[in-house]
Protein backbone atom coordinates (compact mmCIF):
# COMPACT_ATOMS: atom_id res chain seq x y z
CA UNK A 1 0.00 0.00 0.00
CA UNK A 2 2.85 2.36 0.81
CA UNK A 3 4.25 2.00 -2.71
CA UNK A 4 0.80 2.71 -4.21
CA UNK A 5 0.60 5.91 -2.15
CA UNK A 6 4.12 6.82 -3.21
CA UNK A 7 3.24 6.24 -6.87
CA UNK A 8 0.11 8.40 -6.60
CA UNK A 9 2.11 11.23 -5.01
CA UNK A 10 4.89 10.84 -7.58
CA UNK A 11 2.41 10.83 -10.49
CA UNK A 12 0.86 14.02 -9.10
CA UNK A 13 4.27 15.71 -8.75
CA UNK A 14 5.29 14.76 -12.30
CA UNK A 15 1.89 15.90 -13.63
CA UNK A 16 2.29 19.30 -11.98
CA UNK A 17 5.86 19.72 -13.26
CA UNK A 18 4.86 18.86 -16.83
CA UNK A 19 1.93 21.28 -16.70
CA UNK A 20 4.16 24.03 -15.28
CA UNK A 21 6.76 23.44 -18.00
CA UNK A 22 4.07 23.51 -20.70
CA UNK A 23 2.62 26.78 -19.33
CA UNK A 24 5.99 28.49 -19.03
CA UNK A 25 6.97 27.53 -22.60
CA UNK A 26 3.64 28.36 -24.27
CA UNK A 27 2.58 24.73 -24.80
CA UNK A 28 -0.37 24.66 -22.39
CA UNK A 29 -2.85 24.15 -25.26
CA UNK A 30 -0.82 21.26 -26.64
CA UNK A 31 0.16 19.35 -23.49
CA UNK A 32 -2.14 17.84 -20.89
CA UNK A 33 -1.24 15.46 -18.08
CA UNK A 34 -3.87 13.41 -16.29
CA UNK A 35 -3.84 10.64 -13.74
CA UNK A 36 -6.04 7.79 -14.90
CA UNK A 37 -6.61 4.17 -13.93
CA UNK A 38 -3.82 3.09 -16.28
CA UNK A 39 -1.35 5.60 -14.81
CA UNK A 40 0.02 9.05 -15.55
CA UNK A 41 -1.00 10.01 -19.10
CA UNK A 42 0.83 12.82 -20.87
CA UNK A 43 -1.08 13.85 -24.02
CA UNK A 44 0.87 15.89 -26.51
CA UNK A 45 -1.00 17.24 -29.53
CA UNK A 46 1.29 16.69 -32.47
CA UNK A 47 0.41 19.69 -34.66
CA UNK A 48 2.95 22.53 -34.56
CA UNK A 49 4.86 20.87 -31.72
CA UNK A 50 6.01 17.31 -32.29
CA UNK A 51 5.47 16.61 -36.00
CA UNK A 52 4.53 18.39 -39.19
CA UNK A 53 1.33 17.18 -40.84
CA UNK A 54 1.74 13.71 -42.32
CA UNK A 55 5.31 13.39 -41.01
CA UNK A 56 7.08 11.42 -38.27
CA UNK A 57 10.28 13.45 -37.90
CA UNK A 58 10.42 15.41 -34.65
CA UNK A 59 10.37 19.18 -35.02
CA UNK A 60 12.93 21.27 -33.15
CA UNK A 61 10.29 22.67 -30.81
CA UNK A 62 9.76 19.18 -29.40
CA UNK A 63 13.27 18.76 -27.99
CA UNK A 64 12.88 20.78 -24.81
CA UNK A 65 9.50 19.33 -23.94
CA UNK A 66 10.49 15.71 -24.59
CA UNK A 67 13.79 16.22 -22.73
CA UNK A 68 11.86 17.49 -19.71
CA UNK A 69 9.46 14.54 -19.92
CA UNK A 70 12.38 12.07 -20.16
CA UNK A 71 14.01 13.60 -17.10
CA UNK A 72 10.78 13.36 -15.10
CA UNK A 73 10.10 9.78 -16.22
CA UNK A 74 13.55 8.79 -14.94
CA UNK A 75 12.72 9.78 -11.37
CA UNK A 76 11.26 6.31 -10.84
CA UNK A 77 12.72 3.58 -13.01
CA UNK A 78 10.25 0.86 -12.00
CA UNK A 79 7.14 1.95 -13.90
CA UNK A 80 6.77 0.74 -17.49
CA UNK A 81 6.11 3.42 -20.10
CA UNK A 82 4.01 3.08 -23.22
CA UNK A 83 4.07 5.58 -26.05
CA UNK A 84 0.94 5.57 -28.19
CA UNK A 85 0.58 7.36 -31.50
CA UNK A 86 -2.90 8.51 -32.59
CA UNK A 87 -4.22 10.20 -35.73
CA UNK A 88 -7.42 11.77 -36.95
CA UNK A 89 -9.60 9.94 -39.48
CA UNK A 90 -8.29 11.75 -42.57
CA UNK A 91 -6.68 9.04 -44.72
CA UNK A 92 -3.01 9.29 -45.61
CA UNK A 93 -1.67 7.57 -48.71
CA UNK A 94 2.04 8.16 -49.18
CA UNK A 95 4.90 5.85 -50.07
CA UNK A 96 6.23 6.20 -46.53
CA UNK A 97 2.85 5.94 -44.79
CA UNK A 98 0.27 3.90 -46.72
CA UNK A 99 -2.22 4.44 -43.88
CA UNK A 100 -2.69 6.09 -40.50
CA UNK A 101 -1.53 2.83 -38.90
CA UNK A 102 2.01 3.32 -40.20
CA UNK A 103 2.01 7.03 -39.39
CA UNK A 104 0.81 6.58 -35.80
CA UNK A 105 3.18 3.69 -35.12
CA UNK A 106 6.18 5.48 -36.59
CA UNK A 107 5.44 8.61 -34.55
CA UNK A 108 5.28 6.53 -31.36
CA UNK A 109 8.56 4.81 -32.27
CA UNK A 110 10.18 8.19 -32.96
CA UNK A 111 9.24 9.41 -29.48
CA UNK A 112 10.50 6.14 -27.94
CA UNK A 113 13.86 6.58 -29.69
CA UNK A 114 14.07 10.14 -28.38
CA UNK A 115 13.34 9.00 -24.81
CA UNK A 116 15.98 6.25 -25.04
CA UNK A 117 18.46 8.82 -26.32
CA UNK A 118 17.70 10.91 -23.24
CA UNK A 119 18.32 8.20 -20.68
CA UNK A 120 15.03 6.31 -20.37
CA UNK A 121 15.79 2.60 -20.20
CA UNK A 122 14.57 0.77 -23.33
CA UNK A 123 13.38 -2.14 -21.22
CA UNK A 124 10.67 0.12 -19.77
CA UNK A 125 9.36 1.32 -23.13
CA UNK A 126 6.82 0.10 -25.66
CA UNK A 127 5.52 1.85 -28.76
CA UNK A 128 2.15 1.35 -30.40
CA UNK A 129 0.00 3.04 -32.99
CA UNK A 130 -3.76 3.36 -32.79
CA UNK A 131 -4.32 5.18 -36.09
CA UNK A 132 -7.77 6.85 -35.83
CA UNK A 133 -9.27 4.10 -33.67
CA UNK A 134 -9.10 5.88 -30.28
CA UNK A 135 -10.32 9.44 -30.76
CA UNK A 136 -10.65 11.77 -27.80
CA UNK A 137 -12.89 14.13 -29.76
CA UNK A 138 -15.12 14.19 -32.82
CA UNK A 139 -13.44 14.06 -36.21
CA UNK A 140 -16.31 16.17 -37.62
CA UNK A 141 -14.50 19.47 -36.94
CA UNK A 142 -10.97 20.74 -37.55
CA UNK A 143 -10.53 21.39 -33.81
CA UNK A 144 -11.66 17.86 -32.95
CA UNK A 145 -9.32 16.33 -35.53
CA UNK A 146 -6.44 18.39 -34.13
CA UNK A 147 -7.09 16.99 -30.64
CA UNK A 148 -7.11 13.46 -32.04
CA UNK A 149 -3.65 13.91 -33.61
CA UNK A 150 -1.59 13.20 -30.53
CA UNK A 151 1.02 11.09 -28.83
CA UNK A 152 0.25 9.73 -25.38
CA UNK A 153 3.11 8.87 -23.05
CA UNK A 154 1.78 6.65 -20.27
CA UNK A 155 3.75 5.94 -17.10
CA UNK A 156 1.85 2.82 -16.14
CA UNK A 157 0.73 1.87 -12.69
CA UNK A 158 2.25 -1.28 -11.25
CA UNK A 159 -0.49 -3.49 -9.91
CA UNK A 160 0.43 -5.66 -6.93
CA UNK A 161 0.05 -9.39 -7.41
CA UNK A 162 -2.82 -11.05 -5.55
CA UNK A 163 -1.94 -11.27 -1.90
CA UNK A 164 1.06 -8.98 -2.19
CA UNK A 165 1.16 -6.41 0.56
CA UNK A 166 -1.39 -8.26 2.65
CA UNK A 167 -0.38 -9.37 6.11
CA UNK A 168 -1.07 -12.82 7.44
CA UNK A 169 -3.55 -13.10 10.36
Region spans (language model):
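Juxtamembrane linker/hinge segments adjacent to a transmembrane helix in small membrane proteins
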Residues: 1-40, 44-50, 161-169
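Periplasmic OmpA-like peptidoglycan-binding domain that tethers envelope proteins to the cell wall
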Residues: 14, 52-68, 72-79, 86-169
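Residue-level recognition of the N-termini of beta-strands and the immediately preceding loop/turn
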Residues: 29-31, 40, 79-81, 123-125
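Glycine- and acidic-rich phosphate- and metal-coordinating loops
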Residues: 43-45, 82-87
Amino acid sequence: MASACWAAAEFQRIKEEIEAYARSHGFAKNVKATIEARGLVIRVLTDDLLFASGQATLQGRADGLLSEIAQLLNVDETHPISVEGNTDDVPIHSSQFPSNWELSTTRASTVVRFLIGHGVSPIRLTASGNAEQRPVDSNATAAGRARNRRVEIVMRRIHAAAGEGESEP
